[in-house]
Amino acid sequence: MTMDFADRVERVEPSATLAISNLASRLRADGVDVVDLSVGEPDFPTPANVVEAGKRAMDEGHTGYAPSNGIPALKEAIAEKLAADGLAYDADEVIVTPGAKQALYETFQALIDGGAGGGPGDEVVLLDPAWVSYEAMAKLAGGALSRVDLSAHGFQLEPALDELAEAVSDDTALLVVNSPSNPSGAVFGDAALAGVRDLAVDHDVTVVSDEIYEAITYGVEPTSLGTLDGMAERTVTVNGFSKAYSMTGWRLGYLAAPADLVAQAGKLHSHSVSSATHFVQHAGVEALRNTDEAVEEMRAAFESRRDMLVELFADHDVDVPVPDGAFYIMLPVDGDDQAWCESALEEAHVATVPGSAFGTPGFARLSYAASEARLREGVERLAAGDFL
């Protein structure tokens, strides 16, 4: 029997990082020491008090189904956190999801329609470089993509506002803003966000503000897009626990949005994942309320690593755009970036991610969610192999 697959799935390409991941796995299986700078997760343990809160919740019997949109205690804690950021959401305007990725997926599915008869669907505007799953989510929802390249502007949005204005129109259904950015680490300033606001209001566009890295910044304070005049009613704020609290495997995130969007996304949520894991949500309450010191320790470590990496590359006469947030650096590379990454892995045994995976060829993304010793080793190997 030959299965006939849905067009929406056929439109999605396999991850551009798959070849790198498979090659790294083969090398490790052969006993090769791979310096893995491709990983997008913190290398710190989850704070001990959060782990204990999760254990305690299991001991107390919180192992059954949770309310679909989230337990009241966590939704209230999220609303309090957002209020501290200047965002006025009621607890009922929050959906707790198994990871921020699910929150994004539900948002795309709730807002984007495919075109009639297989034609172009609703327009989604991405700012490149853009996290790899935005494109896939847009395609799975039937959307058509429009992309604005920020690489010529040092990955900053403000100098590219004219280009963004050309991309956004009355036909645009959704604009995705990720600040701090994965993969560039750029944090968009108030002038850039004001430009986004003006375009969104003028063209009646909904904006997704993906703020998953908002706790990991260096000398700048990110502004939440929904705090700007005219944006509360047209912004879906997405965040999660994976990056700030080193809880990637716990799978916990959320969206906050106007009540009508929450009602529609809630239908998708209840008919797909049902709910985020019950005891994990109790751990999330602890993370939001009692981890300031641990979060700052991780942030400071990332900043120290960033500074070290920038200096190491400068020692080899390589200038890299200095990120203001997240834990990635975009390294300019010559030629085909996919081939460069594969060769760097095969020959220098350093794993990185090609910039083309994010819509920006000519770069490799390096994660500094690794020890300083491994980061030094990685740069030394790249230099010795003439990759710098």
Please place each PLM-identified region on the residue numbering.
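PLP-dependent class I/II
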Residues: 2, 13-15, 20, 27-34, ...
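Glycine-rich loop at the start of a catalytic domain that most often binds anionic cofactors/ligands
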Residues: 47-55
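N-terminal helix-turn-helix DNA-binding module of bacterial transcription factors
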Residues: 8, 14-16, 59
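Short, contiguous pre-domain boundary segments
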Residues: 2-8
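A glycine-/small-polar-enriched, mobile loop at the entrance of the PLP active site in fold-type I
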Residues: 39-42, 56-74
